[in-house]
Amino acid sequence: MTTPKGVLDFIAGVTWDDLPQEVRQQSKLCLLDLIGVGAGGAGTKLSRIIRDYSALDMSGALPMMFDGRGASAAGVALAGGMTIDALDGHDGFNPAKGHAGCGLLPALYGLAQDLNHVSGQEFLLCLTLGYELACRTALAQHASVAEYHTSGAWVAVAVAGVAARLMRLDGNQTAHAMGIAEYHGPRSQMMRCIDHPTMLKDGSGWGAMCGVSAARLAAAGFTGAPALTLGTDHW
């Protein structure tokens, strides 16, 4: 796959020391905010249903956030993303028209448990990297269509990127992971859920699940079309 090398080098090579102090502090604040909103969301019917589903149909040994029952890494991402999204009180980025963190945190939480080599510093770095990837992907996707679509569409691509880094995939595999995630991500019409409020919310949990699954598929040799974000116009 032909991809701007600088983007992939950035995903694989950025370090904690590269981040300005104010960015490091903001990443910690975002983490605390996501945990707090998720703790509140865990009491909702939406969260209970999705956690029950993940435990049943996406079973594994990794404890889900705010639950403790086991699920796969993708299941942890799905359940946690929808739980944080349940109250719609988490951080946002206006140009992106949505929320990055609610899908990133549970995806990282599941992967960190599964891989068992992720330090706290690397976790925070990948959370920060995920915000950068997610917001750039949002701008790329929104520019490509007139319809306002869900955060899960672009969170999926960001999760795939940080998952690829944590899984130590090479540049080609990373590009495929992000391409798979964009193709499979929930690029749903957001206004339908605003006009008719339901438990679908912003698609963030489904996007997180897609991102984790995409990285797993790419690691196995599955191929995907190039993600819009990887175009030079967005870097």
Where are the predicted features?
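N-terminal core-entry segment
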Residues: 1-235
